[in-house]
Design a protein with these regions (language model features):
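Expand to "…catalyze enediolate/carbanion chemistry for C-C bond making/breaking, isomerization
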Residues: 1-278
Length: 278
């Protein structure tokens, strides 16, 4: 673990102990997390006892992502853009196939993040496999996008009414309810509008907060969540910069060798046969 990762661990410990953080999230979907990055994030997360790793897979039937989630010891897997009963069935059946008898050891959730998914939600709850689903994540940014309204409307009354309706129906089915998308201190009134017991967690891009306690968090908690993501992005940048520098040195050496060799033979070989882009 490098110095920056140690600082990330200290920040996570602070967030867990003082601001009701219960997990960290990585996305194989929109974020495009690579396995090497996820493994480094797992190392950081594992250094803070009691924090779980959540993995958003690339689709409802992203089987390789599920196997990768097993390798990472993920506590939860989340399928994005599940909009129909059939897509939900595909996800649950894929999870049953991958996890087998160990399916009960992981929580499986789906993102309800479009208006089409909202309209189909009652039918989703009627599928025979619904008892295997543990919860839903209401994705507000994609939700407003699917409704043709701007990101700034994630805390609007229209989105709140829709979210409260989803939460009630999910809770009637015994499901956990999570809210994400555009989460900042400005979202606290939105979260406080949920009836008691209807909101289990809310999440930023990387940090997962547990309710109801986290609803009372001061603004500094959200600033620290942003700080963690900045540190994570810097750590990722540093990692790939080392690889890039390593290749750059090799490229420079090979180009010099190429030009020296070319000078020795260029009088005997047609120029058009040797074209090297700098």
């Amino acid at each position: 673990m490098n110095k920056l990762e140690s600082q990330m661990t200290e920040l996570l410990l602070d967030l867990k102990q003082n601001y009701h953080v219960s997990g960290i999230k990585a996305e194989f979907e929109a974020e495009g997390t690579r396995m090497e990055e996820a493994m480094r994030l797992k190392d950081v997360t594992s250094s803070v006892p009691g924090l779980g790793l959540n993995i958003k897979i690339g689709g409802c039937e992203a089987i390789k992502d599920m196997f990768d989630a097993i390798s990472l010891g993920a506590q939860r897997i989340i399928a994005p853009m599940v909009e129909t009963p059939y897509a939900l069935q595909k996800f649950i059946r894929a999870a049953q196939m991958v996890y087998g008898d160990d399916l009960s050891q992981v929580e499986i959730l789906v993102n309800i993040e479009t208006y089409a998914a909202y309209q189909c939600f009652s039918d989703m709850l009627k599928i025979p496999e619904i008892s295997y689903l543990n919860g839903i994540v209401i994705g507000r940014v994609d939700m407003v996008g699917s409704m043709g309204i701007g990101r700034a409307q994630v805390n609007s009354q229209k989105v709140l009414d829709l979210s409260l309706d989803l939460a009630k129906r999910a809770k009637d089915q015994g499901l956990k309810v999570v809210v994400g998308g555009g989460v900042s201190v400005d979202a606290i009134p939105f979260f406080k509008a949920f009836p008691a017991g209807h909101l289990d967690r809310f999440e930023t891009r990387k940090i997962i907060f547990s309710c109801p306690d986290a609803i009372q968090n001061p603004e500094i908690a959200f600033i620290k969540a942003v700080q963690f993501e900045i540190m994570w992005l810097k750590n990722k940048r540093n990692y790939y910069s080392v690889i890039a520098r390593e290749d750059e040195e090799r490229i420079q050496m090979m180009q010099e060798r190429y030009h020296v060799s070319l000078q020795k033979i260029q009088h005997t070989i047609p120029e058009h046969e040797f074209i090297l882009t700098e």
